[in-house]
């Protein structure tokens, strides 16, 4: 785990609070939010979010408000400088990534290219 001064990715209060709420609903305090990147989508790469109980060797862990965000090293290289947030709007509620490394994104924002 690293301190706030050296964090290469921002984990917003809104995202941390939603993770805390979901973990409480699941009644499993070992859960962490994992963000990852896979190939696919209309722009080449897409973001994924899942809950995970374990942290693998090399994973970056960011803690906020008592919950953890976990990123694998391969995904982290594409996410440096980005922000993981949680938004609620007309199109629904979801975790989002604001990624300054993306040169283009699809209309829904779920995939991107570099």
From Swiss-Prot:
Organismal lineage: Bacteria, Pseudomonadati, Pseudomonadota, Gammaproteobacteria, Pasteurellales
Keywords from the UniProt entry: Iron, Iron-sulfur, Metal-binding
GO BP terms in the entry: iron-sulfur cluster assembly
Protein name (record): Iron-sulfur cluster insertion protein ErpA
Family as reported in the entry's similarity comment: Belongs to the HesB/IscA family.
Binding annotation for iron-sulfur cluster: 42, 106, 108
Entries under Gene3D superfamilies matching the protein: HesB-like domain (2.60.300.12)
Record-linked SUPFAM superfamilies: HesB-like domain (SSF89360)
Molecular functions per Gene Ontology: 2 iron, 2 sulfur cluster binding; 4 iron, 4 sulfur cluster binding; iron ion binding
UniProt keyword Disulfide bond, yes or no: no
Entry function: Required for insertion of 4Fe-4S clusters for at least IspG.
Gene Ontology cellular-component annotations: cytosol
PANTHER family, per the entry: IRON-SULFUR CLUSTER ASSEMBLY 2 HOMOLOG, MITOCHONDRIAL
Cofactor: iron-sulfur cluster
